[in-house]
Amino acid sequence: MIDPIHQFNIEKIFTIGHIGGQEIAFTNSSAYMLVAVAVISLLMIGGVAGRQMVPGRIQSLAEISYEFVAGTIRSTAGVEGLKFFPLVFSLFMFIMISNMVGIIPYTFTITSHLIVTAALALLVFLTVLIYGFYRNGLGFFKIFVPSGVPVFILPLVVFIEVFSFFLRPISHSVRLFANMLAGHIALKVFASFIPLLAGLGIAGYFGAVLPLGMVIALTALELLVAFLQAYVFAILTCIYLNDALHAGH
């Protein structure tokens, strides 16, 4: 059977240089990050260039993406949250496009690596932390003290709030990583059954119909998951940014 884990191997394409004895290399992961950025850039440039009253497909996709993210920010972080639109939009589009590119056979899914999702989650966490203190000063600590909590259980509640706050980047990154990893492993496993069964002759061809159907169904499901995981990451980012914007509310 084909190794379902092999698709996640990071392979060096060429060496860029060395820093402190550590090799800096351009890998397949780096290449697909550039592919994702290129696709997003082409979509947005194509949507803006030659705008028409009756939008075409590219313009419609760009406008729908823009309005969808802007609406998500307004509903979770308020109008003030729109100052973070470039961050949230970039994260949403980068994750969604990366997820969808990874569904194409023989490509690479960069979001199936924890180091990538952890870097994105830490970016959000540090943005919330830095802006929270910049905007609110020590008043940012109010997010750890929910209003209306009885005094006798307040220390426990504060401990839980602080603990959950510092767990945010872990849960934020692992959720995306685990979903993409599990989905692609399942796809690879079912896909590997198709040539194995087809090699058994006529009976095998009939038997291969079931895993083929599963692959088609899982691919459709993975397309949905690719969007949903990008949306979940974006909306959690908005919720966390809301804490920095409205500490203590």
Swiss-Prot record:
It is a multi-pass membrane protein. Signal peptide: none annotated. SUPFAM superfamilies: F1F0 ATP synthase subunit A (SSF81336). It is found in: Cell inner membrane. GO terms for molecular function: proton-transporting ATP synthase activity, rotational mechanism. The keyword Cell inner membrane applies. The chain crosses the membrane at residues 30-50, 84-104, 114-134, 143-163, 196-216, 221-241. GO terms for cellular component: plasma membrane; proton-transporting ATP synthase complex. The keyword Hydrolase does not apply. Its main location: membrane. Keywords: ATP synthesis, Cell inner membrane, Cell membrane, CF(0), Hydrogen ion transport, Ion transport, Membrane, Transmembrane, Transmembrane helix, Transport. Pfam families: ATP-synt_A. It comes from the Bacteria. F-type ATPases have 2 components, CF(1) - the catalytic core - and CF(0) - the membrane proton channel. CF(1) has five subunits: alpha(3), beta(3), gamma(1), delta(1), epsilon(1). CF(0) has four main subunits: a, b, b' and c. Belongs to the ATPase A chain family. Key component of the proton channel; it plays a direct role in the translocation of protons across the membrane. This is ATP synthase subunit a. It comes from Rhodopseudomonas palustris (strain BisB18). The gene is atpB.
